[in-house]
């Protein structure tokens, strides 16, 4: 919502330009209607994963920029039905689309070894093994609500830390449930294929795992490229990215105060 409004206000003085916004969460349609009402047919909302951006029917010759905002909206975080946040008291769901598996399924059914790896690799949680072990021991009673999981984590992580003790575990579950890693990689690859010469690709990340993938992608598809087994090989004389910002742009102290989630 904020990105689209800013683009219209700052960049799209030409009334022939349009914004096409993608979101896999169907509830975003409510917000999208506000923009449609304000900007008419210059704003188009598509209820779709951004990994499927290549399936949209538009001429890539007229495509000027693609922006990925990998964070969750305040509405999504506060939605008790989604159970995305450790600060909300809702069911352990975390699904943004028509996913078959919920966070409840993962926490209550996944074997110890796999659960421990999820916390370790997707959340970089140092106490992944002991948290997974305690979940296994407790889940015979069923772990249903977000606060049930928070209580397990807080009983293990006693020491005070700069971030909430549940941050990494909840992050890892969101990544797994919504298949975020492969969605991001596919979205980046398909964007590269779509963008014409001179097109812009900007990505807003919110944690180190996303950040590493994006940096790796740009390095692989830039002037300093080295072919990678994780991304398709670029043939010689093909278009490549010119990296504008060698270092990521991070939020100011004032922005963090106004928008705490941006601290990531």
Mark where each language-model region is:
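S-adenosyl-L-methionine-dependent methyltransferase catalytic core, i.e., the SAM/SAH-binding region
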Residues: 1-264
